[in-house]
């Protein structure tokens, strides 16, 4: 498993999400996870069935979710990720395993380092992922690492190495951070689709 999500009571929102990575460390935010929480609490009657907007307390703040409902079930959940913050120069150079890389640091509730590569399919993430995650530049908290290929101005291909979990099939906050970094770098237009291992 990539980790564990607990749905708990909240005094400030409809519910509170606690998220733990595969290594047992507590995660700050999980974009896809908070969307799953929204679907779960709606579908299981933990919030009023008249609601189309719900709030979830996270360590990254309260997130607002918009629900699309069909036949009494949430079929789509979107989340306002909140404000992002640039956490590096644009771009910043870094040496990992003796090789120079350029990255863009973005925080969307949790830290991400976005690296641009010629192709994502041939990367040996099991070997290089930990070196990026645990690099001294990101100490002591570590970093989620996205490897991005810019297919065109409206399409990114992404693989992700998540801190505490390793390579995962998808990462909502990582996709958000990658699109923002790519816009700031001038690589994509104001909207772009991100292809991951299991979807877009």
Predicted regions and their residues:
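Short, charged, solvent-exposed linker or helix-capping segments at domain edges/interfaces
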Residues: 88-92, 125-127
